[in-house]
Design a protein with these regions (language model features):
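Eukaryotic scaffold repeat domains enriched in small/polar residues
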Residues: 1-304
Length: 304
């Protein structure tokens, strides 16, 4: 099924992932590709990390400990090695792992008594890493802060908090570091405010992007373009200037259905998204999309 137009035409295949009989997707929240174009899916059923090759063939799986809480998923290369950074919303942790699943670093809740207590929970939804190794954690389902750590896990600072003014957030659901302009910038999917905020790495607001989006979830930067899943049933591409390029697989009826996102199988269509939550692209520009639905869905968009 071909979707898109012009330079953004793709063959859409929601049946790409070939799972073994003993693994079933839960809610598919995150997806990344490594330097060899292998694809890793982060979902809520054990084993939570499932590895495929570019053709969708199953390669490996691990990560039972993240069952139920698997959410944010980020791949970062350091010193010639690639690492996975994850957030677990159930246990309130961030972890750094090798591509084989060995845990290198774990971060719990920051010790901020003025921000967190028994009632005000810490629920990290996403994580990103700057070129210098600093780690940024978005507390999207908790108290709407972004926390910054050094590469070794030492706490540096926090910024944000609840609000709608620049620099404040309402569900900072996704976070990523953009280096397209040379100077790194922090992109935050301020989902509850229906916008994207761009900040310095110190947390100072720079600009707000709020057109042609509804519920931005996360980001992936490929070449000059930014790709993001809009939870309200579409994947969106913006250019380097933060301007709209196109929507892919848009279905503006899906998220309005009773019971969404857990819709009956008969509703899903091969050329439309329902609840895209995570996205990535490989070297060739093929796009992979993970959807938030009870039995998961992972789609490959092969660039034409």
């Amino acid at each position: 099924m071909i979707i898109g137009s012009g330079t953004h035409r793709y063959e859409m295949n929601p049946h790409w992932a070939q799972l073994p009989e003993d693994i079933r997707f839960g809610y598919c929240h995150g997806i990344v590709t490594d330097s060899e174009n292998n694809v890793y899916v982060f979902h809520t059923n054990a084993p939570c990390v499932v590895k495929f090759d570019a053709e969708g063939r199953y390669l490996d799986s691990w990560g039972d400990e993240f069952a139920g809480g698997a959410h944010g998923f980020y791949l970062h290369a350091e010193g010639g090695e690639e690492f996975l950074y994850i957030t677990d919303t159930s246990r309130g942790i961030v972890a750094k792992l090798t591509l084989a699943g060995e845990k290198v670093l774990e971060l719990g809740a920051p010790g901020l008594t003025d921000a967190y207590d028994a009632e005000r929970k810490y629920v990290p939804t996403d994580v990103a890493v700057a070129p210098n190794g600093d780690i940024y954690v978005a507390d999207g389902y908790g108290q709407n802060w972004v926390h910054r750590y050094a590469a070794n896990g030492d706490y540096i600072a926090s910024f944000g908090g609840t609000g709608s003014e620049p620099g404040k957030f309402k569900c900072p659901h996704g976070i990523s570091v953009d280096v397209r302009r040379g100077e790194p910038e922090l992109y935050v999917a301020d989902r509850g405010n229906h916008r994207i905020q761009v900040l310095t790495l110190e947390g100072e607001p720079k600009r707000i992007v709020d057109e042609n989006m509804d519920m931005p979830c996360s980001f992936f930067f490929h070449g000059d373009e930014m790709i993001f899943p809009d939870l309200h049933s579409r994947v969106t591409i913006f250019g380097r200037d933060d301007k709209f390029v196109t929507h892919l697989g848009e279905d503006q009826l899906a998220y309005k259905q009773q019971g969404w996102p857990n819709l009956p199988a008969a509703y899903f269509r091969d050329n439309r998204f329902s609840s895209p939550h995570g996205v990535c692209a490989d070297k060739a520009g093929n796009i992979y999309v993970a959807e938030w639905t009870v039995d998961g869905r992972v789609t490959k968009l092969t660039k034409k």
